[in-house]
Curated annotation (Swiss-Prot):
The lineage of its organism: Bacteria, Pseudomonadati, Pseudomonadota, Gammaproteobacteria, Alteromonadales. It is found in: Cytoplasm. Keywords: Cytoplasm, Endonuclease, Hydrolase, Magnesium, Metal-binding, Nuclease. HAMAP family: RNase_H. InterPro entries: RNase_H, RNaseH-like_sf, RNaseH_domain, RNaseH_sf, RNaseHI. Monomer. PROSITE patterns: RNASE_H_1. It comes from the Bacteria. The gene is rnhA. GO terms for cellular component: cytoplasm. It is an enzyme of class 3 (hydrolase). Residues 3-144 form the RNase H type-1 domain. This is Ribonuclease H. It comes from Shewanella woodyi (strain ATCC 51908 / MS32). CDD domains: RNase_HI_prokaryote_like. Its main location: cytoplasm.
């Protein structure tokens, strides 16, 4: 059995207006290497971008890894570490008997986590955490760049902040 590569991933999402133009930012660190990823969407929500950031990061990995994934989104972290288990058992219905919002991204994030060992960490946003601040900048710049790409899963009647 081989030892898994260990890396750190930092993620953030941004939305102007919520809903409005949005973007995500990712900083991935492996040993002395750093990779940044970001993109923007014409109409989306902050929570969708907070979910998309770790999805993009995890989907970029070609082999199973041991990951410390850090975000300032309690929604994303609690969703993937706590709420998702009940949602899956109840066929993606919440404890209040409503359909899970952003279910397309929750399913995608769940699938993206399966081959990795992930420790999910939370940091307070806008509190001087260097990598989180960089992700915030990447996400905001992507959102401000007048993106034309559609967030195909965004449904105004179903999704919310």
């Amino acid at each position: 059995m081989s030892v898994l590569k260990q890396l750190s991933i930092f993620t953030d999402g941004s939305c102007l207006g919520n809903p409005g133009p949005g973007g995500y930012g990712v900083v991935m660190k492996y040993k002395a290497h750093t990779k940044e990823l970001s993109d923007g969407f014409a109409l989306t929500t902050n929570n969708r971008m907070e979910l998309l950031a770790p999805i993009i990061a995890l989907e970029a990995l070609k082999v199973p890894c041991k990951i410390i994934l850090t975000s300032d989104s309690q929604y994303m972290r609690q969703g993937i570490t706590q709420w998702i288990h009940g949602w899956k058992k109840k066929n993606w219905i919440t404890s209040t008997k409503q359909p899970v919002k952003n279910v397309d991204l929750w399913k995608r994030l769940d699938a993206a986590t399966q081959s990795h060992e992930i420790d999910w960490h939370w940091v307070k946003g806008h509190a001087g955490h260097v990598e989180n601040e960089r992700c915030d900048t990447l996400a905001r710049v992507a959102a401000e760049a007048k993106p034309t790409q559609e967030d195909l899963g965004y449904q105004p009647s179903v999704s919310s902040s």
